[in-house]
């Protein structure tokens, strides 16, 4: 049985403020976690307001069951299916705001039974939803050396990806890796250079977790789904925690904030330009955590909040 691990919500007030809440609006918390953002949103909604939360983690669903509020509902599933959920509910283009708090939550990191962290020993799992897909141990056991190296390099920007991948494959031939501390020790031994103030396994654990959970694909699909869901002037508020996530969010907002990409000098009338489709989002800027929040919650250090608004078409 896992302990009741606490979660400090990062950029709580800023992310919710980015939604520009209306008391009677319909909102989505795409990453319920332990409900920090959801509870703040509910506290600012009126009797006619509505909040729909989403999470694929069974422990998050259990936490959501503790919220006894007729304005609140929870969907057990990936946020990548956001467009499907709103279409099934007849809410396409009717959502007034969507909040996404990306990455792994503190309770997931701190619970050794989930296998996300090497700080405490646990089974080498790393799945957001333990009932679906391969665990990290299962994938590492069957993956080719080149595939492991590609994952470590692509999703962890690990400079010693090939050396670490070779060590993993060689170890699995004799004694399969099954524990987080085993993998962390192996990575440390395989790394010829140690970064100051950073465990050698940090990048590899991030990379494997992202791959196991298809995190970047999930984010991309969720962002595309937001365009289907949001009403005109609806807000998108997204918190990311590492450069790969933030780069993806930044690129998405920039892409949909541009008008039609027409070659210079092409003779088109105003009506023809309109037919090409105008921008769909307006970027409203980004926020970083303040010094006090970083001191209170060191995990907030790398977080970035980006906010955008849906443009009527």
UniProtKB/Swiss-Prot annotation:
- Please state the Enzyme Commission number of this protein: 2.1.1.199
Q: Which GO terms describe its molecular function?
A: rRNA (cytosine-N4-)-methyltransferase activity
Task: List the GO terms this entry assigns under cellular component, sorted alphabetically.
Answer: cytoplasm
| UniProt-annotated location(s) | Cytoplasm
Residues holding S-adenosyl-L-methionine: 35-37, 55, 79, 101, 108
Q: Which key words are in the record?
A: Cytoplasm, Methyltransferase, rRNA processing, S-adenosyl-L-methionine, Transferase
InterPro entries xref list: RsmH (IPR002903), SAM-dep_MeTrfase_MraW_recog (IPR023397), SAM-dependent_MTases_sf (IPR029063)
Family, per the entry?
Belongs to the methyltransferase superfamily. RsmH family.
Q: What does this protein do?
A: Specifically methylates the N4 position of cytidine in position 1402 (C1402) of 16S rRNA.
**PANTHER family with a match to the protein in the record:** 12S RRNA N4-METHYLCYTIDINE METHYLTRANSFERASE, S-ADENOSYL-METHYLTRANSFERASE MRAW
Protein's recorded name? Ribosomal RNA small subunit methyltransferase H
Organism of this sequence: Edwardsiella ictaluri (strain 93-146)
Q: What is the lineage of its organism?
A: Bacteria, Pseudomonadati, Pseudomonadota, Gammaproteobacteria, Enterobacterales
């Amino acid at each position: 049985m896992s302990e009741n691990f606490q979660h400090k919500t990062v950029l709580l007030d800023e992310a919710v403020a980015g939604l520009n809440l209306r008391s009677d609006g319909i909102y989505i918390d795409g990453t319920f976690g332990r409900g920090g953002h959801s509870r703040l949103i509910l506290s600012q909604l009126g009797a006619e307001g509505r909040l729909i939360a989403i999470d694929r983690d069974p422990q998050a669903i259990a936490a959501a069951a503790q919220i006894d509020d007729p304005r609140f509902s929870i969907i057990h599933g990936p946020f990548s299916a956001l467009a499907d959920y709103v279409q099934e509910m007849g809410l396409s283009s009717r959502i007034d705001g969507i909040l996404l708090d990306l990455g792994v939550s503190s309770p997931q990191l701190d619970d050794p039974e989930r296998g996300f962290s090497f700080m405490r020993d646990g089974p080498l799992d790393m799945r957001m939803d333990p009932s679906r897909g391969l665990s990290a141990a299962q994938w590492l056991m069957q993956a080719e050396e080149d595939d492991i190296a590609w994952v470590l390099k692509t999703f962890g920007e690990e400079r010693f990806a090939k050396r670490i991948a070779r060590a993993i494959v060689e170890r699995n031939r004799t004694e399969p890796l099954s524990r987080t501390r085993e993998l962390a020790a192996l990575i440390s031994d395989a790394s010829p250079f140690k970064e100051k103030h950073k465990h050698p396994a940090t990048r590899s654990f991030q990379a494997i977790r992202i791959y196991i959970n298809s995190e970047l694909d999930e984010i991309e699909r969720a962002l595309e789904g937001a365009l289907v869901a949001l009403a005109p002037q609806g807000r998108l508020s997204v918190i990311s925690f590492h450069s790969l996530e933030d780069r993806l969010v930044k690129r998405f907002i920039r892409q949909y904030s541009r008008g039609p990409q027409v070659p210079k000098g092409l003779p088109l009338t105003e009506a023809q330009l309109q037919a090409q489709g105008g921008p769909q989002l307006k970027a409203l800027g980004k926020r970083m955590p303040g010094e006090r929040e970083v001191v209170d919650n060191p995990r907030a250090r790398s977080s970035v909040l980006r906010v955008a608004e849906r443009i009527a078409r």
